[in-house]
């Protein structure tokens, strides 16, 4: 049976307006939901206490330097876990990427915050947030984000440090990003148009400007002139004049004054904090399948969102890094172009997209949706050495008569592939072998104890653990902070 057997449920789900889970399929006879026996108050309190103890044990056991990394193509829900873990850490640090990352978190009152560059620990007053040298900084966007936070009562004063080694992302990088995509025509990458790739290109070709250059405005204009001329020589559609340069320099003089209190030698700050036994939580942007080296190249980002990016993006020694938590949706999504072996098309994909509200935080683009790809997940686990997984959006699968796991890839001739292929010609032709498991009908969004999950949901979680060889310690069953099960 496939997802198409429950397509008729979409209308009912839309009418219900829940936006959380699939409606239960009822092809022949109405399903009967047995009433749940209400537990005595004392037992309920005891269960809550056990859950709280398990949560405290899980979080307190994390190493001094821990990381939260994406293990698909992004949008897995990393920000929520970082937000939940942040109160137990002194510092939350971003190591790579820029405003192309979109992390959605909720405060204790349920107010939604969409962060792009500011680390997700910002909602916790005692947490210092660090944007490391591996990130790229669009200063106007950074200030817009801070202004938005402060207008909603979040104090950012003295709580964010930006590496003096981080590269500056200019509006010209964003313009070049759009021109580059237009030039590629039908083979475009599908970037966020935030200028990330062109900025990293400037970094690699060694004509980029860094945050520390804002302290030397006497030479800033000459360096920026090189960038403008480079873009103008490369793209006919890029207009450049000396007046544009003067305006941009004057603009950045104002930015430099405001940014100065945020600028720090974050390599020194972080390593000194490690010596002082402070706890550091690293928040990865994007995900391993978008890694410039290990992702589905060229449909990737321009940085390293895998474990290696922590060291190079923050200046932390490998021996200091302990627990790494891989965040993975209970199904798979992808924004933009590139191979997606388990993708669902037509009404099947639409149903999953609507139920999971799968639209990009940064771009608003509808995400491509499909079944959980175990081959890709296992590959990510191997690269990063995850100590545990956070399985998110399990509630979205509620109501399906069956759920599927893509457990292996076969070539067109039927030969099984032994690993995740780097060759896109091979990857685009693979035939996915699925393992079918029974679904569950009940709404699990209010469940807070693993033992209270339907048995079918528990089997799904445990089968994932068996297949990838990494334990699932955290299970997301809704968007709020409290919608998390500690296993």
Swiss-Prot record:
**Which residues are noted in the entry as Mg(2+)-binding?**
75, 102
Transit peptide, UniProt annotation: 1-46
Its EC number is 6.3.4.4
- What keywords is this UniProt entry annotated with? Chloroplast, GTP-binding, Ligase, Magnesium, Metal-binding, Nucleotide-binding, Plastid, Purine biosynthesis, Transit peptide
Q: Which Pfam families match?
A: Adenylsucc_synt
Detail which positions bind GTP: 74-80, 102-104, 367, 393-395, 476-478
Cofactor(s) this protein cannot do without: Mg(2+)
Listed binding positions for substrate are 361-367
Recite the UniProt cofactor note for this protein. Answer: Binds 1 Mg(2+) ion per subunit.
What the entry lists under SUPFAM superfamilies is as follows: P-loop containing nucleoside triphosphate hydrolases
Magnesium among keywords: yes
Q: What is its main location?
A: plastid
Question: Which proteins does it associate with, and in what oligomeric form?
Answer: Homodimer.
* Stated role: Plays an important role in the de novo pathway and in the salvage pathway of purine nucleotide biosynthesis. Catalyzes the first committed step in the biosynthesis of AMP from IMP.
Name of the protein: Adenylosuccinate synthetase, chloroplastic
Species name: Oryza sativa subsp. indica (Rice)
């Amino acid at each position: 049976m496939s997802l198409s057997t429950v397509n008729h449920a979409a209308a009912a789900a839309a009418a219900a307006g829940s936006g959380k889970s699939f409606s239960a399929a009822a092809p022949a006879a109405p399903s009967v939901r047995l009433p749940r026996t209400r537990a005595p108050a004392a037992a309920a309190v005891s269960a809550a206490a056990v859950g709280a103890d398990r949560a405290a044990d899980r979080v307190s056991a994390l190493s001094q330097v821990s990381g939260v990394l994406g293990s698909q193509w992004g949008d897995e829900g990393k920000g929520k876990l970082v937000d939940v873990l942040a109160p137990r850490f002194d510092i939350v640090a971003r190591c790579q990427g820029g405003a192309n990352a979109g992390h959605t978190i909720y405060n204790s009152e349920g107010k939604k915050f969409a962060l792009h560059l500011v680390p997700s620990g910002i909602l916790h007053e005692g947490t210092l947030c660090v944007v490391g040298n591996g990130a790229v900084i669009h200063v106007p966007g950074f200030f817009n984000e801070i202004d938005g936070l402060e207008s909603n009562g979040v104090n950012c004063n003295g709580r964010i440090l930006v590496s003096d080694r981080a590269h500056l992302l200019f509006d010209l990088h964003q313009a070049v990003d759009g021109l580059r995509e237009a030039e590629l025509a039908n083979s475009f990458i599908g970037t966020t148009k935030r200028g990330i790739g062109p900025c990293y290109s400037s970094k690699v070709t060694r004509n980029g400007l860094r945050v520390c250059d804002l302290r030397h405005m006497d030479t800033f204009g000459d360096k920026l002139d090189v960038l403008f001329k480079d873009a103008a020589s490369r793209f006919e559609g890029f207009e450049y004049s000396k007046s544009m340069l003067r305006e941009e320099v004057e603009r950045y003089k104002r930015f430099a004054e405001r940014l100065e209190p945020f600028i720090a030698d974050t390599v020194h700050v972080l390593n000194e904090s490690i010596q002082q036994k402070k706890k550091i939580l690293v928040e990865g942007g994007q995900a391993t399948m978008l890694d410039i080296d290990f992702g589905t190249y060229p449909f990737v980002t321009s940085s390293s969102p895998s474990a290696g990016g922590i060291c190079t993006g923050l200046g932390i020694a490998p021996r200091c890094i302990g627990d790494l938590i891989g965040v993975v949706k209970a199904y798979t999504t992808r924004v933009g172009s590139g191979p997606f072996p388990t993708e669902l098309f037509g009404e099947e994909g639409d149903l999953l997209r609507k139920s999971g509200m799968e639209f990009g935080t940064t771009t608003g683009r509808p995400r491509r949706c499909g079944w959980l790809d175990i081959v890709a997940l296992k590959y990510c686990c191997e690269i990063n050495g995850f100590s545990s997984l956070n399985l998110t959006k399990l509630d979205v699968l509620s109501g399906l008569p069956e759920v599927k796991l893509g457990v292996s890839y076969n070539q067109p001739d039927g030969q099984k592939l032994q690993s995740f292929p780097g060759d896109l010609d091979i990857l685009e032709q693979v035939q996915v072998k699925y393992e079918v498991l029974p679904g569950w009908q009940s709404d699990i969004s209010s469940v807070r104890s693993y033992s209270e999950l339907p048995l079918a949901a528990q089997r799904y979680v445990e089968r994932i653990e068996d297949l990838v060889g990494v334990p699932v310690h955290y299970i997301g069953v809704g968007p709020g902070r409290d919608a998390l099960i500690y296993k």
